[in-house]
């Protein structure tokens, strides 16, 4: 059986908002598996967490750049926020975004692309040597449409086109480009705030949907619901889940009456003058999924003093 540490209990508690003793029991019941412990708590009705939250700890900048029917979003990491506020680093991020807009989202292609007398990889190496801190082009994504607009939004912008979060949204339409651009930016802001996981229910990972179905069913069985009612209750629960995680199903943040994103887009077709289709979206939050190495400050001081 796995040893349950205080750090594990703390992580589960921060992820789920559940009390310490319940978190400890959940970890004990699931042999220390955090994801399984979250499901165990949900089945007991103690947690609404859908999955383990990524521990965001990396520094750097998200860059986003669009040009009519195409757009890119990139993440460049640094070791400290101090460097992220450095003008040379900011210029590096903007340059990489410009290159990505030309060559696409493949990291090897971006790194090999020529810039001046060097390449992107060479420019990153030069910046590392000059600034004295490690930097990495972590990821990139691109969207394009044959006609329409790719719009972007940067949240907590440090400079124009770069900040702590970036979103691009692709709209396919033969309508007015200026109206599409306004709608696209509003949708990008919605994506930043609502963090949808998929465009619609059919775009969700079937394994994720099945996991939700099983968690809900087990929860209602433990509540003593009749088996012949559970399937219907679960289906209704999935509809609610879709409204939480699917972009087209979500309540549009720019509408106080609670219309869905799909309804808002449909209504916008009047201004645009043509049908509109959301082809895709990408949302990058700085450092998501990266865990920063933690240290015990007291232990470091003791070690430096020769204590044990």
Swiss-Prot record:
One of its GO terms (molecular function) is translation elongation factor activity. Associates with the EF-Tu.GDP complex and induces the exchange of GDP to GTP. It remains bound to the aminoacyl-tRNA.EF-Tu.GTP complex up to the GTP hydrolysis stage on the ribosome. GO terms for cellular component: cytoplasm. Keywords: Cytoplasm, Elongation factor, Protein biosynthesis. CDD domains: UBA_EF-Ts (cd14275). The keyword Cytoplasm applies. It comes from Rhodopseudomonas palustris (strain TIE-1). The gene is tsf. SUPFAM superfamilies: Elongation factor Ts (EF-Ts), dimerisation domain, UBA-like. This is Elongation factor Ts. Belongs to the EF-Ts family. The keyword Secreted does not apply. Residues 80-83 are annotated as: Involved in Mg(2+) ion dislocation from EF-Tu. InterPro entries: EF-Ts_dimer_sf, Transl_elong_EFTs/EF1B, Transl_elong_EFTs/EF1B_dimer, Transl_elong_Ts_CS, UBA-like_sf. PANTHER family: ELONGATION FACTOR TS (PTHR11741), ELONGATION FACTOR TS, MITOCHONDRIAL (PTHR11741:SF0). It is found in: Cytoplasm. Gene3D superfamilies: 1.10.286.20, DNA helicase RuvA subunit, C-terminal domain, Elongation factor Ts, dimerisation domain.
């Amino acid at each position: 059986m796995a040893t349950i540490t205080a750090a594990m209990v703390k992580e589960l508690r921060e992820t789920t908002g559940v009390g310490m003793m319940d978190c400890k029991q959940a970890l004990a019941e699931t042999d220390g598996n955090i994801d399984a412990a979250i499901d165990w708590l949900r089945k007991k009705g103690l947690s609404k967490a859908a999955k383990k939250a990524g521990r965001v700890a990396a520094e750097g900048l998200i860059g986003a750049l669009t040009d009519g029917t195409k757009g890119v979003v990139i993440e460049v990491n640094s070791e400290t926020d101090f460097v992220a506020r450095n003008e040379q680093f900011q210029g590096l991020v903007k340059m990489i975004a410009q290159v990505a807009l030309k060559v696409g989202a493949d990291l090897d292609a971006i790194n090999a692309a020529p810039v001046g007398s060097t390449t992107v990889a060479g420019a990153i190496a030069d910046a590392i040597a000059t600034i004295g801190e490690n930097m990495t082009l972590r990821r990139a994504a691109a969207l394009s449409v044959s006609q329409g607009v790719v719009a972007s939004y940067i949240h907590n912008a440090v400079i124009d086109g770069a900040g702590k979060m970036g979103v691009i949204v692709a709209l396919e339409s033969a309508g007015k480009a200026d109206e599409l651009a306004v709608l696209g930016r509003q949708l990008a802001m919605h994506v930043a705030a609502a963090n949808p996981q998929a465009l619609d229910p059919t775009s969700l990972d079937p394994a994720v949907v099945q996991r939700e179905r099983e968690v809900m069913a087990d929860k209602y069985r433990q509540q003593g619901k009749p088996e012949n009612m559970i399937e219907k209750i679960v289906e209704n629960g999935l509809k609610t889940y879709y409204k939480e995680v699917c972009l087209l199903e979500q309540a549009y943040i720019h509408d106080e009456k609670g219309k869905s994103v799909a309804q808002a887009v449909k209504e916008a077709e009047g201004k645009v003058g043509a049908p509109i289709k959301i082809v895709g979206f990408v949302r990058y939050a700085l450092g998501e999924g990266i865990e920063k190495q933690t240290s015990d400050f007291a232990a470091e001081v003791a070690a430096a003093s020769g204590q044990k």
